[in-house]
UniProtKB/Swiss-Prot annotation:
Signal peptide span: 1-23
Keyword tags: Chitin-binding, Disulfide bond, Glycoprotein, Repeat, Signal
Domain Chitin-binding type-2 residue range list: 28-85, 88-146, 147-201, 220-283, 286-355
Entry protein name: Peritrophin-44
Biological source species: Lucilia cuprina
Length: 356
């Protein structure tokens, strides 16, 4: 049976750096991207933690002779647990002058000499295949032995690289690929890219998008300019021009436009509230949606936005579009907002109109 030791006070984010490109995460960092529940300790096959509200609130260790089975959430016989947690021991049982997978990084490998590991990484977009003993492209689905945060967090998330502040690791189907933001730096607190360096100062709290909490002000002129001839019986609804879900209600050409927004889960388009993916809104598409990911328009359905507090986080904004982050697996290049995942084929259809 597991014994849980509750921790109190501030939690220090400890990073174990073994070589320049290794990516060992503390349990505190793992909890930042993990729902409530138990997680494995990426630095110890015997240890585990408990996450609550994205914080590490407890730690524990299995009895001697047992290892933590993350799939079952129990302390289990070593025969039932596959765990490699320390790259410095990668060469202990390897043949001298040979190459082995870096157990902390899927696109890394180590050269073994006198039981000592010297680790490096494969070229960009490639992973190390421990069976073929060579670097191959991710679409070939190489066997990855890395016991990294991608083994412990939900699928299709981007996490910060603890050894290279401002860079990220994309996690898809348990496999992690290191990357850099084209627009600048990755902010691990916000889960997205930004132009300023988050490593120079404390990262800000996520901003809240327009109309998410506070209503926008009414508009005294919108009904005169765009309202046509509205009446109390036949009001006219006009986009607020700032959000995807907001509108102005006009009941008189001379009266003010009263701001309102669609019911949760809907966006406003051409006078009515509709399913969000049926039109390419050019404002923050996270608004009014209880989603972790939404599609980014004008990217041919190959990019997506990360949402927190109904607001896209840290994404580049350019030419009236949120660019977002790409699906990194070349075998699954298209993002589908309906399923919330990267898929093989484009979701474009007569009703799914984000692929513009």
């Amino acid at each position: 049976m597991k014994e849980l030791q509750i921790t109190t006070g501030c939690l220090l984010l400890m990073v174990a750096a073994i070589g320049k490109t290794s990516a060992i995460y503390s349990m505190s960092e793992t909890c930042e991207y993990t729902p409530d529940g138990f997680i494995a300790d990426p630095n110890s096959c015997q240890s585990y933690g408990y996450c609550k509200n994205n914080q590490l609130v407890g730690t524990g260790k299995c009895p001697d002779g047992y290892l933590y089975n993350n799939k079952l959430g129990i302390c289990d016989s070593p025969a039932n647990v596959k765990c490699i947690s320390d790259s410095k021991n990668a060469c202990l049982h390897a043949t001298d002058n040979s190459f082995v997978a870096d157990p902390t990084n899927c696109n890394g490998y180590c050269y073994c000499s006198n039981k000592t590991a010297t680790c490096t990484t494969c070229p960009e977009f490639q992973l190390f295949d421990s069976k073929q003993i060579k670097c191959v492209y991710a679409l070939e689905k190489p066997e990855c032995t890395a016991d990294s945060i991608c083994r412990l967090v939900p699928n299709a998330v981007y996490v910060g690289n603890p050894n290279e502040c401002g860079e990220y690791i994309s996690c898809f189907n348990g496999i992690g690929t290191e990357g850099r933001c084209a627009s600048g730096y990755f902010n691990k607190q916000l889960g997205g890219c930004q132009t300023t360096n988050p490593c120079l100062a404390s990262s800000p709290n996520p901003d809240i998008g327009l109309g998410v909490i506070e209503n926008l002000a009414d508009n005294n002129f919108v009904c005169q300019v765009n309202g046509g001839n509205p009446t109390e019986e036949k009001p006219v609804f006009i986009s607020d021009g700032q959000t995807c879900m907001g509108y102005y209600k006009c009941t008189s050409r001379n009266g003010p436009g009263i701001w309102g927004k669609c019911p949760k889960g809907l966006h406003f388009n051409e006078g009515k509230c509709v399913t969000p993916f049926t039109f390419p809104c050019t404002f923050d598409r996270c608004g009014n949606l209880n989603r972790e990911f939404v599609g980014a328009i004008r990217t041919e359905c190959k990019n997506f936005l990360i949402c927190k507090n109904e607001t896209s986080q840290g994404m580049a904004y350019n030419y009236a579009k949120y660019i977002g982050l790409p699906c990194t697996d070349k075998n699954y290049p298209f993002f589908n907002e309906v399923s919330g995942t990267c898929e093989k084929t484009s979701p474009k259809s007569d009703t799914y109109k984000l692929c513009v």
